[in-house]
C-alpha cells in the first residue's frame, strides 16, 4: 500500500510542477499589448475629433504628380479590355479594363542594341475595374483617351455531327 500511495503522491507533485511550468510558459507568451500597432493607432485616432474636408470644385492634380508637362498635355490613352488568351479556355484576363499610353519616339541603343525611349509612361499599363473608373482617372490626369468597347463574341451554334460531315473539309487526308 505504501508503494501505491507513494506513486500517487509522486504523480501529484509532478503534475503540480508541470502545471506551474505550463502556467509560467503561457504567461510569458501573452503579449504586453493585445492590440496590433495599426489597430492601436486607429483607436488613438478615433478618440480625437476628426472632420472631413469636402471640396465642391474639381481639382487639377497634374501639377502635383511630378511628370513633365509635355508628357501630360499631349498624351493619348487607349482604354480597352484585353483579348482572351488563346492558350487557355478561361476568361480570367478579360474582367478588367486596361489603360495603355501611345508609343513615342524610340531609338536603338548603339552599345547594346536595345530599344530606348525618353518617355517615362510608355511602358506603363494601368488597370481599372470598370470603364468609368478608367475614364475618370484619365480625365483627372488631363489625358485624352480613346475607348475600345468590349467585344462580345457571338456563339456559333453547330451540332456535333457537323464535325463528321462528308461534304465539309473537316478531315484531312493523309495521302
Curated annotation (Swiss-Prot):
Subcellular location: Mitochondrion inner membrane
Main location: mitochondrion
Bridged cysteine pairs (disulfide): none
Domain of life: Eukaryota
Biological processes, Gene Ontology terms: brain development; electron transport chain; mitochondrial respiratory chain complex I assembly; proton transmembrane transport; reactive oxygen species metabolic process; response to cAMP
Family affiliation: Belongs to the complex I NDUFS4 subunit family.
Protein name, as recorded: NADH dehydrogenase [ubiquinone] iron-sulfur protein 4, mitochondrial
Record organism: Pan troglodytes
Amino acid at each position: 500500500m505504501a508503494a501505491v500511495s507513494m506513486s500517487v503522491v509522486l504523480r501529484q507533485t509532478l503534475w503540480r510542477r508541470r502545471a506551474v511550468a505550463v502556467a509560467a510558459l503561457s504567461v510569458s507568451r501573452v503579449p504586453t499589448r493585445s492590440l496590433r500597432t495599426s489597430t492601436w493607432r486607429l483607436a488613438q485616432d478615433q478618440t480625437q475629433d476628426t472632420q472631413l474636408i469636402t471640396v465642391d470644385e474639381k481639382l487639377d492634380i497634374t501639377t502635383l504628380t511630378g511628370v513633365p508637362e509635355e508628357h501630360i498635355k499631349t498624351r493619348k490613352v487607349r482604354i480597352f479590355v484585353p483579348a482572351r488568351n488563346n492558350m487557355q479556355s478561361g476568361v480570367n484576363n478579360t474582367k478588367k479594363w486596361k489603360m495603355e499610353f501611345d508609343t513615342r519616339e524610340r531609338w536603338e541603343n548603339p552599345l547594346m542594341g536595345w530599344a530606348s525611349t525618353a518617355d517615362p509612361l510608355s511602358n506603363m499599363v494601368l488597370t481599372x475595374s470598370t470603364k468609368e473608373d478608367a475614364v475618370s482617372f484619365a480625365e483627372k490626369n488631363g489625358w485624352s483617351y480613346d475607348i475600345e468597347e468590349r467585344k462580345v463574341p457571338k456563339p456559333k451554334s453547330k451540332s456535333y455531327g457537323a464535325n463528321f460531315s462528308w461534304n465539309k473539309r473537316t478531315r484531312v487526308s493523309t495521302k
